[in-house]
From Swiss-Prot:
Superkingdom, taxonomy of origin: Bacteria
Pfam annotation, one family: MoCF_biosynth
Record-given protein name: CinA-like protein
Entry-linked InterPro entries: CinA, CinA-like_C, CinA_C, CinA_KH, Competence-induced_CinA, MoaB/Mog-like_dom_sf, MoaB/Mog_dom
PANTHER family tied to this protein: NICOTINAMIDE-NUCLEOTIDE AMIDOHYDROLASE PNCC, NMN AMIDOHYDROLASE-LIKE PROTEIN YFAY
Source organism of this protein record: Syntrophobacter fumaroxidans (strain DSM 10017 / MPOB)
Record family assignment: Belongs to the CinA family.
UniProt xrefs under HAMAP family: CinA_B
Gene3D superfamilies: 3.30.70.2860, CinA-like (3.90.950.20), MoaB/Mog-like domain (3.40.980.10)
SUPFAM superfamilies named among the record's database cross-references: CinA-like, Molybdenum cofactor biosynthesis proteins
Length: 424
């Protein structure tokens, strides 16, 4: 196959005590890995260290041993715990030298804000000898060390993303030109655990076709990722289509909800639009999460009419027509009440489709009969009524998110079964 040699791979080093302490998620690492992969590059190593200079030095030395390129984020600021510049100076054996252009720009910015120059700010402009400043209005520099391009980016996500897109990836593409094309596709799988997905696809000989396959759980979904590098985009697409057909055949078309960015809320919206149906949502424990997801899709006003956030029993009676007797006999968290909520939303909004959600998100409110995590979901269409009862585990927010996802999945199943329309 005509493709970039497989040894062109790099290392990523993310720096910050706040990551190791769990104060923030390492979103920078995820973003960088995805952007590189989507452009035909690969990471063979990903390291996260705290702010201790010795740890940064040893990690840089390790990366230099075999990486074809290195990306580092964090530790470029003016505070005492920003030690990346000093660590690079030691690891690369390059003295720190003031970058006069950067010094001038920093002084201009401070003057604009009415702030004085300080040793702390001056530290930001002391770069390892031979470093090339990137992003004059933000921290960041580049070093070509022994023919290994090394990119040092700020930890601030917005600044990191800008420099990655505008400087790093274009420079990597120039240094390591892709001989051909690359293509990635995600197949979204519903209603099947990751282990079962893997079992059904285990002996699928993708490499013979020239496609790499991966598995990624995403909440209640499982993503099957297909990646191809070939002489042309058409050849990439042909290879991926061949593997995708086998993936769908082995998993079953009823489990495939979409591809790439075709999230459930987008897919169900397309189904509703195709049928000419409008919908409403009646939410209790989710408090609007379901409606937020449905209306996050551009053009959702074509099919989404309104939401009823009926948290209390009285609200369920007043706005959805749920009877006091039903609430007394079955309780607010029950399949009959979920169905009554959906039916009431249909009547109140004068729409064809509605979802009703009621549950116990916790941490209090559970019982032996209805423990925390119990959620009842109903879907009503002109052709059928369907109700499900779930028991989700986790903290309050994860239960609420799981309930909203389960409601979307129920709606997708109902609309798919009804219309016999499947992922293309």
């Amino acid at each position: 196959m005509d493709e970039r040699p497989p040894e062109i791979s790099g290392s990523l080093l993310t720096i910050g005590d706040e990551i190791l302490l769990g104060d923030i998620l390492n979103g920078n690492a995820r973003h960088i890995a995805l952007e590189l992969r989507n452009r035909g590059f690969r990471l063979d190593r990903m390291i996260t260290v705290g702010d201790r200079e010795e740890d940064i030095v040893s990690s840089l030395v390790l990366c230099l041993a075999d990486a074809r390129f290195i990306i580092v984020t964090g530790g470029l600021g003016p505070t005492d715990d920003d030690r990346t510049n000093a660590a690079v100076s030691r690891a690369f054996d390059r003295p720190l030298v003031a970058d006069e252009a950067y010094v001038g720009r920093l002084k201009e910015r401070l003057a604009e804000r009415g702030q004085a120059w300080s040793n702390e700010v001056a530290k930001m402009a002391e770069l390892p000898a031979g470093a090339v400043k990137i992003g004059l209005d933000m921290a960041g520099f580049f070093i070509d060390h022994g023919n290994v391009p090394c990119y040092f980016l700020p930890g601030v996500p917005g600044e990191m993303k800008f420099l990655l897109a505008e400087v790093v990836i274009p420079d990597l593409a120039r240094r390591f030109p892709l001989r051909g094309a690359y293509l990635k596709e995600v197949v979204r799988v519903q209603g099947m655990v990751e282990s079962e997905v893997n079992r059904r696809l285990r002996d699928l000989d993708c490499r013979r076709i020239g496609v790499e396959i991966g598995y990624l759980p995403q909440g209640s979904e499982n993503w099957v990722t297909l990646f191809a590098v070939a002489a042309s985009e058409e050849e990439c697409r042909t290879r991926i289509e061949k593997v995708r057909e086998e993936v769908v055949a082995r998993l079953g078309e009823k489990h495939i909800s979409g591809r790439n960015d075709e999230c459930l809320e987008k897919v169900v919206g397309e189904r509703l639009r195709e049928r000419g149906w409008r919908m409403a949502a009646a939410e209790s424990c989710t408090g609007g999460l379901l409606s937020t997801r449905l209306t996050s899709i551009a053009g959702s006003s074509d099919y989404f009419d309104r939401a009823f956030i009926t948290y209390s029993n009285q609200a369920k009676q007043d706005h959805l027509g749920v009877s006091e007797e039903m609430l007394r006999v079955h309780g607010a968290v029950s399949e009959p009440v979920a169905l009554a909520m959906a039916e009431g939303a249909c009547r109140g909004a004068r729409v064809e489709v509605a979802l009703g959600i009621t549950g116990i998100a916790g941490p209090a409110g559970g019982s032996a009969e209805k423990p925390v995590g119990t959620v009842c979901i109903a879907c009503v269409t002109p052709k059928e009524k369907r109700v499900e009862k779930h028991r989700f585990e986790g903290v309050r927010e994860s239960i609420r998110q799981s309930a909203a996802q389960a409601a979307l999945l129920l709606l997708w199943r109902v609309l798919t079964d009804d219309s016999n329309l499947h992922c293309r």
